[in-house]
Regions:
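C-terminal "exit" segments of structured domains
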Residues: 162-259, 265-271, 276-286
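Von Willebrand factor
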Residues: 1-47, 77-80, 94-99, 137-139
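VWA/integrin I-like adhesion module and closely mimicked acidic/polar interface patches used
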Residues: 7, 11, 62-70, 75, ...
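Beta-strand-rich structural segments
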Residues: 302-317, 327-329
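A short beta-turn/strand-edge loop motif at beta-sheet boundaries
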Residues: 89, 210, 222-223, 313-326
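Short, compositionally biased P/S/T/A/G/V-rich stretches that sit at domain boundaries
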Residues: 282-300, 310
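Short, solvent-exposed loop/linker segments at the N-terminal edge
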Residues: 206-208, 297-303
């Protein structure tokens, strides 16, 4: 309920939809938990299926900020923890909280008080921390009244992060910091410009063959329809029909997801509404695993050991030297009995 004032432009909805579209298309699931005077969960949906992503975004579009002011943060966080408890134990698990940071319980709500909700916030934080679930908080501050201290505490207690945002442009960097921890992603700023009604051409480079997905994120205050993409061979890509491209757009953003993009220089042309400020980012993730081969089965302190370390992608050893440039690493050996390192 309090989001009616803090998020008049429905930034939370646009940001959550952008996150859904940016999420990788393999080995990932997303659940939506909506909380007001009651909690509604979509359950975990596999993001490898486009229809599931569309379903999640339809649910988000249907969210209404209605009076009276109900924001039961504690109940929402407890439900989010419960949803993650039932997910695949092998995957990294995170909670992303979109909120104005205010917990509001209407005075007429039976058997529920603000104190109850705040106690549940603390319980959820403790459970998340114990289970290794990081909580990332996005504080929506359109009315300047965000409870930053609450968000800082939630994030710090679970080894997460928080971000205060007034515009969707504030969020791709923050999203990338999340993806960097769970999806091995990197971000590049391609360009930003004020639209003049003509096409604005930009270039970006895919510099190695192990990029699994590349997300071109176009942020604007008005919806963009005219986008042209050209691959390194100079061929224009049909962004609506090409099987290696997924195109999504909404009120505040457009997103092109390129699957296993070709190495080389790409170009993109964007035509926006005159006067609109447009920002274009590239966020990409790798399909890479680290393989360590050790000759010795017994390690003796003070004795030399031989080991080989490789990067693998799609089951094959990576030989692309560009990926190995500027890499460094360290090895820790620990005695299982004494715990000495």
């Amino acid at each position: 309920g309090s989001m009616r004032k803090a998020d008049k432009e429905r930034l939370a909805i646009e940001a959550a939809k952008l996150f859904v579209d940016m999420e990788k298309t393999s080995n990932a699931s997303i659940a939506l938990v909506e909380f007001s005077n009651k909690v509604v969960s979509s359950g975990l949906l596999d993001t490898s299926q486009q229809e599931n992503k569309n379903q999640l975004k339809e649910v988000l579009d249907g969210v209404r900020y209605s009076a009276p002011a109900h924001t039961d943060t504690g109940a929402g966080l407890l439900e989010a923890v419960s949803v993650l408890d039932g997910s695949d134990v092998r995957n990294e698990k995170v909670i992303i909280l979109f909120t104005d940071g205010k917990t509001d319980i209407d005075a007429g709500t039976p058997n529920r008080t603000i104190e109850d909700s705040l106690n549940d916030v603390n319980t959820a934080i403790q459970e998340a921390a114990q289970k290794g679930y990081k909580i990332y908080c996005i504080g929506l501050n359109a009315d300047g009244k965000v409870d930053e201290e609450m968000l800082r505490n939630i994030a710090a207690s679970t080894d997460g992060q928080y971000k205060i945002a007034t515009d969707v442009n504030d969020l791709p960097d923050f999203f990338n910091s999340i993806f960097a921890q769970i999806d091995k992603s990197e971000k590049q700023n391609i360009d930003e410009f004020d639209a003049d009604g003509n096409y604005h051409e930009m270039h970006f480079t895919i510099d190695n063959s192990s990029v699994m997905e590349a997300n071109i994120v176009i942020l604007s205050s008005m919806q963009i329809e005219d986008i042209c993409l050209t691959d390194p061979s100079g061929t224009e890509v049909d962004i609506q029909e090409n099987a290696r491209v997924e195109f999504n757009n909404s009120a505040k953003y457009s997103l092109l997801k390129l699957f296993t993009p070709d190495v080389g220089e790409w170009s993109i042309k964007v035509k926006g509404v005159t006067g609109d400020h447009i920002k274009v980012n590239l966020i990409y993730n790798y399909d890479i695993d680290l393989i360590v081969e050790v000759e010795n089965t017994v390690v003796v302190k003070g004795k030399k050991i031989n080991l080989q370390v490789y990067l693998y992608s799609r089951g094959e050893k990576i030989t692309d030297k560009a990926i190995y440039q500027n890499m460094s690493g360290y090895l820790t050996i620990q005695n299982k009995n004494s715990q000495e390192q």
